[in-house]
Amino acid sequence: MKTYIVGGAVRDELLGVAVKDRDYVVVGATPEAMVAQGYTPVGKDFPVFLHPKTHAEYALARTERKTAPGYKGFVFHTDASVTLEEDLIRRDLTINAMAQDEDGSIVDPFGGKRDLELRIFRHVSPAFAEDPVRILRIARFAARFPEFTVAAETNTLMQDMVTAGEVDALVPERVWQELARGLMEVRPSRMFEVLRDCGALQRILPELDVLWGVPQPAQYHPEIDTGVHIMLVIDYAAGIKADLPVRCAALLHDLGKGVTLPDQWPRHHGHEMHSVKLVDTVSKRLKIPNDCRDLALMTAREHGNVGRALELRANTIVNLLERCDAFRKPQRFIEMLQASECDHRGRTGFADKPFPQKAYLQAALAAAQTVNGGEIAELTRQRYPDQAQRIPEAIHEARVQAVAAALKKQPGDPKE
């Protein structure tokens, strides 16, 4: 019985990256032998055990065989005769198929260390093609390690997997899980570049895939291409370490530009409402969590209004605040402003340009929040006892007055 550290922990240590979790594989053992040494069995699909002291997970070395389409269509085999190399060969990439012995030496049967030095993602064996999740994993790794490239033969294999329909067998929850993890990496644009290169993006997120090649007005978007713009936006969001809902909104806010008819290019009048419909469609299909969906919907609908904030009247600004439910959910409104800022700065040459609209609308919200709705409601009831509809009107008007007064000190000076 021999124990090895395997996978990402070995890779990250060789890269000089902080190791967060360690995976262990045990060679030459049986479930009975593990239990006899005090390990607690916890695995459902294959034998995994908790260490009696550290509670770290230890898996018995295993092989696997493809039995059905998709990432769940596998049968696992494990016994004391399975070797370390047999366990490692089932892994996705050479850089993830290394092991570390108890004495610290590296076991590298597939050239993972060399591929680390070359900064290449290369599949271990043709069995890579049996699990479509591996396409998403490579794309996610590209977002984490943006200096890496996909080996030509691996990209060809991924293209073949897409053509064979393997990607279509992925369950929506798993697609979103991997996309969300990739969005939270250091350069999420690399994830989508890899997915586009192999054709997978067209299958899992066609609403985004069509944005490449769709032009925008050069005076506002020097990068011109809408797909390029979205990549700049999500990378800016990553650079400011935005939370996942903001990054999701940054990714999806301009989907409507993909349905603008070519004879209307490069203008995209009314794209906001098209974006709202498409965000809703994508959210339902991928089962995107409510917090991400709601912020993406709001950003798709309102990012143009945020961009024009300095030109808006106080009444229009209060309408915006009320439409966004900013008084009940102010933090979500602030996140929408942050996503809109990412949209503004995610343009070639705009990363360091001022975006006063964010502070302007935050000041408007703060001013409107000073209005005592309960007090106004009571006064209105006393004055108009049989006209309840006047209460929201009175509160709205008080907010308009408060916003107009507060923003006179801000650039833009909205009118009442």
Curated annotation (Swiss-Prot):
Annotated GO molecular function terms are: ATP binding; CCA tRNA nucleotidyltransferase activity; cyclic-nucleotide phosphodiesterase activity; magnesium ion binding; phosphatase activity; tRNA binding
Please, one GO biological process term? RNA repair
Q: Write down the EC number.
A: 2.7.7.72, 3.1.3.-, 3.1.4.-
The residues the record assigns to binding CTP are: G8, R11, R91, R137, R140
Q: Which CDD domains match?
A: HDc (cd00077), NT_ClassII-CCAase (cd05398)
Under the heading SUPFAM superfamilies, the entry gives: Nucleotidyltransferase, Poly A polymerase C-terminal region-like
Annotated Mg(2+) binding lies at D21, D23
Describe its partners and assembly state: Monomer. Can also form homodimers and oligomers.
- Record's function text: Catalyzes the addition and repair of the essential 3'-terminal CCA sequence in tRNAs without using a nucleic acid template. Adds these three nucleotides in the order of C, C, and A to the tRNA nucleotide-73, using CTP and ATP as substrates and producing inorganic pyrophosphate. tRNA 3'-terminal CCA addition is required both for tRNA processing and repair. Also involved in tRNA surveillance by mediating tandem CCA addition to generate a CCACCA at the 3' terminus of unstable tRNAs. While stable tRNAs receive only 3'-terminal CCA, unstable tRNAs are marked with CCACCA and rapidly degraded.
Q: Which family does it belong to?
A: Belongs to the tRNA nucleotidyltransferase/poly(A) polymerase family. Bacterial CCA-adding enzyme type 1 subfamily.
Protein name stated in the entry: Multifunctional CCA protein
Q: Which organism is it from?
A: Janthinobacterium sp. (strain Marseille)
- Per the record, the gene is cca
